[in-house]
Amino acid sequence: MFVAVRAGKSACRRVSGEAVRVAVDGVVGVVGAPLVSGESAAAGAGGSGGGAPAPPRLPRVPGFAARRADGSVKARGKALRERVPRDAHAEFVPDPARPDAVGAVEESGRGRIPALTPLRVGRMAANPFAFLRGSAGLMGYDLARTPMTRITAQLCGDAHAANFGLYGDARGGLVVDLNDFDETVPGPWEWDLKRLAVSLVLAGRVAGAGEDACRAAALDAVGAYRRTMRLLARLPALDAWNAIADEELVSHTDAHDLLGTLERVSAKARANTSGRFAARSTEATADGGRRFVDAPPVLRRIGDAEAGAVAAALEQYLTTVSEDRLPLLARYAVHDVAFRVVGTGSVGTRSYVVLLLDHRSEPLILQVKEARPSALLPHLATAGFDVPPVAHEGRRVVLGQKRMQVVSDILLGWTTVEGRAFQVRQFRNRKGSVDPAALAPDQLDDYGRMTGALLARAHAHSADPRLIAGYCGKNTELDEAVATFAVAYADRTEKDHAELVTAVRAGRIPAEEGV
């Protein structure tokens, strides 16, 4: 199911028949206040005649809403405008104690594999959009000092424009959604939305779009978020929950200029499978199996001890996947493990690929990726949000992903390798993505609307859409404010990127560029 998100368009929707379960403790609202109040409100009949209302037949059940709320949730959201006017979101004044860009990059590299630091720096130095992708923590520092309603949702934590893409569902279809959750954590919904808007401005500038087109993409992304949240607030709870993001989303977001690009990406995604990766990255062994082949610096073989530790950790992984998936995994044998570099912000973390083969020697590739503490955690604390302890970082990533996506990888899980937390997922699951920095201006605007709508749907799984919709309202005041912020923060990011490039050229920080 999805919706039309351009003003004046009639709403369309498509409902999937399957809901995704999430933990009820992931539903959060205004910090320090319940989403639904009024537990003592009378619920039964017989309260007429001026006497005391009859007590409800059943008590309030923990984990469920109260039968009747005092006042409107949407009205409570609207009332927040008095404390945080919507136009206040245009503000961006860099803190005098803000870390310099090079220092922030160096700090974010602590705990990563030192030999891969030059590769990570080189990727971030490629352009300002790439710098933004690798600096979620630095932006978190800045966002912690911006106006906030204090409505919380499960955040992606790194909702830049390149973190949306296509992937396969269990039935062979393609889903369009957020697809990376390394930084996921409950936090203020505005942070994800502002990061998306900034990234669209930077992607447009890298692509050579004019300033008006870049700002329009950010503006329309926020508008799509606002209108989608408003519609979700009006739907029955189950329909809103099951709002699905699939290949038909483009027609519902009026993103027709993006059709050709999405069709090409979809065709590539359908061919992006474990089988194809194994055909290019493995070779036959004497015992009839297969093993990975070296392709440095991205893919490299590892020693027996390291490979054995990763393989042994899969036993713990099996305890974290849904029990109905165990018979499927039991049909595969573990053949090999290799190290594979991924992403921009993730470069330097430990990431492995595991080759599994079934009885026909058909491959399934699992990714075992290190899960580090979210880069947003210290900044949430600075902003005054409660930051509960995390028992396992891999579990945090997996549960955050399931809370935000309508359809998630059926093999998601987590494990521990030599004391480090990891997440486990399918490596090639018909994944595809649009490069926002390669889009024409009219396509970038469409892409902004599509991703804004997707982000609203993802947030509505954990925050009450009525609360956010009440705050956002019907007019474009919030859209204009966040677009103004996005342009200002994009300017700051360009300066940060220039500082990094200068440091690389001066030899202050090593970089391996073009890889």
Where on the chain are the PLM-derived regions?
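Intrinsically disordered, low-structural-confidence terminal and linker regions
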Residues: 35, 55-81
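Intrinsically disordered, low-complexity regions enriched in glycine and serine
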Residues: 45-50
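Conserved ATP-binding subdomain of kinase catalytic cores across diverse folds
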Residues: 72-89, 93-117, 126-156, 161-254, ...
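Plant regulatory low-complexity segments
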Residues: 251-263
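Acidic catalytic cores of enzymes that act on phosphate-bearing nucleotides/polynucleotides
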Residues: 261-346, 355-357, 363
